[in-house]
């Protein structure tokens, strides 16, 4: 089948949407499907390159850091998509490219499915100081989106519940986004662990709490810095891998708390290098409750890293307490779980690491693509039945006329 995936975010940006899109495209192509990406150019110039169509856009960082809005119509490229005649459109974002996705689906008379990646009510502080007003607006806009698509995809039961609470008007399927598990092969674990630890001058005995992700206010990394103040004397290092608009704020916070000597900020790391950082850690930590699914959780597990994360609904089917990690609700629970890990014998830790890696199988990109393939086929068939009914009804009116 021919699949058009639309997204406001694409490489070189680093986030869960980009990871999901790239992995889905790769796996669908391996299964013999034709896949094109429609996204926004980093300039006002529209062009196509290696099956990716870039529509001209302008900076919209005043709305959200790194955001862009389409300005160039790119008529020839748009016409090329219509002539390519996709079988289905899969939109990944709710803004510029969504409206292009809707227009293409209508013109080609094909289904439009949409993945809801973002809990927007956790991001309303970027454009409104009033949380209740922001939540009401998000609910309204989400319902509007749901009226324009044939089906929505929730990466986790957390998002499925949220969408139902919003009162959306279309079917919802829970399909976790997939990752390439081979990137986290155990054969590379020892080499990567030693290389990264040498680079940042950490010895083998140091307990390293690893955070990987974008540094933004909604990620609540400040909480990890506050907890680090309590554990730094016990030979524990907090390693924060990633960049973002909140990096300098976090550096200042670390200085205020007196933890700069036990916190490592790596800054932005290239996507090709991110996988090599996981083995450097002993536990993966996160204080965020704004994740829809949290692909970094899946990546950490795939690398054999148990989780120590703030309790969140998106982790309900992911964390098996005491087996592949822990969820905490308070500082006391965080400190207790960390102490539990440190007091384990080496063979117990290895057992947890092994089980963590095993539990990541549910996030295989092959499983992800297989589920998407089935959904696409079902939506295409339903759209065909709908068209046939419409034609039959029109034919009946002609006869009666």
Predicted regions and their residues:
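Short hydrophobic beta-strand element within catalytic cores of glycosyltransferases
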Residues: 306-309
């Amino acid at each position: 089948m021919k699949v058009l995936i639309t997204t406001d975010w694409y490489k070189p940006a680093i986030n869960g949407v980009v990871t999901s899109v790239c992995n889905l495209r790769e796996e669908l192509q391996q299964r013999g499907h034709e896949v094109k990406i429609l996204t926004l150019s980093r300039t006002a110039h529209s062009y196509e390159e290696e099956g990716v169509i870039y529509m001209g856009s302008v900076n919209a960082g005043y709305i959200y850091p790194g955001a862009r809005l389409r300005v160039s119509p790119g008529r020839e490229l748009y016409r090329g998509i219509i002539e390519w005649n996709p079988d289905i459109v899969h939109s990944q974002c709710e803004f510029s490219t969504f409206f292009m996705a809707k227009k293409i689906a209508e013109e080609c008379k094909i289904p439009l499915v949409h993945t809801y990646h973002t809990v927007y009510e956790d991001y309303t502080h970027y454009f409104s100081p009033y949380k209740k007003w922001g939540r009401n607006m998000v609910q309204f806009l989400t319902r509007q989106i749901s009226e324009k698509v044939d089906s929505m995809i929730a990466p986790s039961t957390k998002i499925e519940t949220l969408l139902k609470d919003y009162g959306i008007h279309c079917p919802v399927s829970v399909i976790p986004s997939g990752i390439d598990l081979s990137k986290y092969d155990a054969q590379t674990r020892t080499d990567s662990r030693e290389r990264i630890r040498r680079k940042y001058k950490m010895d083998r005995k140091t307990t390293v709490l690893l955070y990987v992700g974008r540094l933004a206010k909604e990620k609540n990394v400040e909480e990890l810095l506050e907890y680090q103040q309590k554990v730094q004397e016990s030979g524990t290092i907090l390693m924060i891998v990633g960049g973002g608009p909140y990096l300098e704020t976090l550096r200042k916070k670390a200085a205020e708390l007196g933890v700069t000597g036990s916190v490592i900020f790596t800054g932005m790391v290239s996507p090709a290098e991110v996988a090599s950082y996981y083995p450097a850690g002993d536990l993966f930590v996160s204080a965020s409750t704004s994740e829809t699914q949290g692909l970094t959780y899946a990546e950490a597990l795939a690398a054999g890293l148990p989780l120590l994360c703030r309790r969140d609904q998106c982790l309900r089917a992911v964390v098996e307490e005491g087996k592949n990690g822990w969820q905490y609700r308070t500082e006391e629970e965080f400190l207790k779980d960390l102490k539990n890990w440190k007091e384990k014998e080496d063979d117990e830790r290895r057992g947890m690491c092994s089980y963590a890696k095993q539990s990541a199988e549910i996030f295989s990109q092959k499983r992800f693509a297989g589920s998407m393939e089935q959904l696409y086929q079902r939506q295409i068939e339903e759209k065909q039945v709908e068209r046939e009914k419409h034609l039959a009804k029109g034919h009946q009116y002609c006869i009666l006329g």
